[in-house]
Amino acid sequence: KFSKKDMFCELTIYFDEKSSKMKAMIDTGNILKEPITKLPVIIVEKRALVQLLPNKILENTEKILGGDAETIESKYATKLKIIPFSSVGRENGILLGFKPDKVLINTEENEELINNVIIAIYNKELSRKNEYSALLGLDIFERRKENESIKTFSR
């Protein structure tokens, strides 16, 4: 049986010696992958990333996607990714993303540490009622069977 509480988890993203914690919804429709590495993508609202990324990046995602990367410090430039996507009502969209150091996912049953994932910066709100700030796909949980970079800790 699948209940509403099974649809949510807590996410902590670690990047550049900082961390940000947020509530995430598990989205069965999120099959987004970064095209070169094929890593799964977690979509995160921009406002949930203010502790992790410099304002120069967060406030200029559209400019950066358009090719204006002059404002980016080199230590961030190598971590940034461009992620093409299609969704209902929006074909050929692109999101700016980055490779975090690690992501910790807390569910009712366990805690999982994931290294191989990409975070996409979403400029709008994902939830009208601010119930969550991130969307992650089921494939992140399914990958744990074949991916040695995921560590699971039972509660």
Describe each region flagged by the PLM.
Residues 1-43, 48-51, 60-61:
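Canonical alpha-helical transmembrane segment with a positive-inside/aromatic-interface signature
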Residues 6-8, 27, 40, 46-47, ...:
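A broadly tuned "polar low-complexity/structure-edge" signature
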Residues 9-14, 18-28, 63-140:
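Aspartyl protease catalytic core from the pepsin/retropepsin fold
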Residues 54-70, 136-155:
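A short, charged
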Residues 36-48, 56, 124-136:
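A signal for specific C-terminal beta-sheet/loop modules enriched in small/flexible residues
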